[in-house]
Amino acid sequence: MLSLLAVVSLAAATLAAPAASDAPGWRFDLKPNLSGIVALEAIVVNSSLVVIFDRATGDQPLKINGESTWGALWDLDTSTVRPLSVLTDSFCASGALLSNGTMVSMGGTPGGTGGDVAAPPGNQAIRIFEPCASPSGDGCTLFEDPATVHLLEERWYPSSVRIFDGSLMIIGGSHVLTPFYNVDPANSFEFFPSKEQTPRPSAFLERSLPANLFPRAFALPDGTVFIVANNQSIIYDIEKNTETILPDIPNGVRVTNPIDGSAILLPLSPPDFIPEVLVCGGSTADTSLPSTSLSSQHPATSQCSRIKLTPEGIKAGWQVEHMLEARMMPELVHVPNGQILITNGAGTGFAALSAVADPVGNSNADHPVLTPSLYTPDAPLGKRISNAGMPTTTIPRMYHSTVTLTQQGNFFIGGNNPNMNFTPPGTPGIKFPSELRIETLDPPFMFRSRPALLTMPEKLKFGQKVTVPITIPSDLKASKVQVALMDLGFSSHAFHSSARLVFMESSISADRKSLTFTAPPNGRVFPPGPAVVFLTIDDVTSPGERVMMGSGNPPPTLE
């Protein structure tokens, strides 16, 4: 493993977040080593590794053979980083896991970049990271062949989501570099592996211009896909190639880049797996104005909007509630007990950089929000959001930040870089430098004895009933038992692509030594592919166990 020399040192502790309290509660834990690249994209690929990507500026501290790299493997067990060689520029790409466990990163920056490397354009790139069995990442590499494996259309700032056959639907983006709005849009959908020879045009993406980069999309349990962009939303039927227009987000709130709110598919529960979507943050800014007429001090919104995707729910429309504070660029992440973590973001301004009338250094945003909150979906309206017992960090996590649940049950948090290049702390005129510090946000159960799943089948069939051995701490009454099947998702630009939590019917034996649960009925409820199972007893969650949902075969390809 390569050293980051002085850059990756315990000196980072001098810039640490506040020390954790001795009292029980959530805690931020600043790691002793730096990431070497800005973690602006992150995805968990096994029990101990997070793949992170940066942009190819050629000035990152992390090196391979003396040259900068913009990919890395972060080891959750040792808090160390291993460089990962990347060919094309992965800046502002998307990604997900296929049905066979392969991680795919797609899209990126148009045009090559310089520095001490010459990276080819990334906006048609497909980057493939095969399943990695090594806990440290030793021998695990990224595959690229731009001449033969590439997108049908150029895409910078696209989104992606794993769908019912285990392939990826790739949505939107820009053909060209753009400082703020989407001025040369890729108003289309395509798939990986490809399902046809040409992209599918999207009237929805055309309507939702100009603030529709990184659309938020979720695979619904009937196989359709919910998409929200700008202040508009639809349900897209992949098999019929039709769209159903849904109500606009209330009060003119816009939620996609460069006016970033976040969105999440709320946990799905048996027997009906009724889908609901929550959208939080963003802004009411007027997109008819040029970015130079906007301000880094423009207030973000505290609004959250929630819709039930049934005929009755769609007719009723979005239900409005509010976070404890306004947030631009928040991120919403599933907690295994069914709550939603709300973290990161800024109180004012916008995404992107150096585009508004009064950037803060290079940042279009200001006033970082430093205290997370929890959203409880089944609590009464007006009482769903709380930050009681939540810690406060000193590290801004705004533009180009990431967060993801890990298999250990805590949250990896990294990144922040509203600058064109790697910009170290102390750079004159820069309030928000490139951030290499990594934290975890640790729930209270991390500091006590926990339930454990002692074994788990390597693969689960849809609808399969399984009994596995467990242990339960003696002080837990087991009055509430939850078994969650989760896709931990791909974090980038205030959105968690493919993130999913499906609760499974379950029971515990009288002697508390075994757990019986039933897997989801089909690949529409949980798209086939890698998953993590968590057991939560009385809000104390076990470490997760990885399984392959379905056969583990690759998704279908175009014949």
UniProtKB/Swiss-Prot annotation:
Keywords: Glycoprotein, Oxidoreductase, Secreted, Signal
Single GO MF descriptor: aldehyde oxidase activity
SUPFAM superfamilies associated with the record: E set domains, Galactose oxidase, central domain
Localization per record: Secreted
Activity-pH dependence: Optimum pH is 6.0.
EC number(s) from the headed UniProt entry: 1.2.3.15
UniProt keyword Metal-binding present: no
Catalytic activity: glyoxal + O2 + H2O = glyoxylate + H2O2 + H(+); methylglyoxal + O2 + H2O = pyruvate + H2O2 + H(+)
EC class: oxidoreductase
Domain of life: Eukaryota
Keyword Glycoprotein attached: yes
Major location category of this protein: secreted
Leader sequence segment: 1-22
Transmembrane segments annotated in the record for this chain: none
Family matches, as InterPro entries: Gal_Oxase/kelch_b-propeller, Gal_Oxidase_central_sf, Glyoxal_oxidase_N, GO-like_E_set, Ig-like_fold, Ig_E-set
Database matches in Pfam families: Glyoxal_oxid_N, GO-like_E_set
Cellular component, GO annotation: extracellular space
Glycosylation sites: N33, N46, N100, N231
UniProt-listed GO biological process terms: hydrogen peroxide biosynthetic process
Role, per record: Catalyzes the oxidation of aldehydes to the corresponding carboxylic acids by coupling the reaction to the reduction of dioxygen to hydrogen peroxide. Substrates include, methylglyoxal, glycolaldehyde, acetaldehyde, formaldehyde and glyoxal. May act as a source of extracellular hydrogen peroxide required for the oxidation reactions catalyzed by the lignin peroxidases (ligninases) and manganese peroxidases, both involved in lignin degradation.
PANTHER family: GLYOXAL OXIDASE (PTHR32208:SF96), SECRETED PROTEIN-RELATED (PTHR32208)
Descriptive protein name: Aldehyde oxidase GLOX
UniProt gene name: GLX
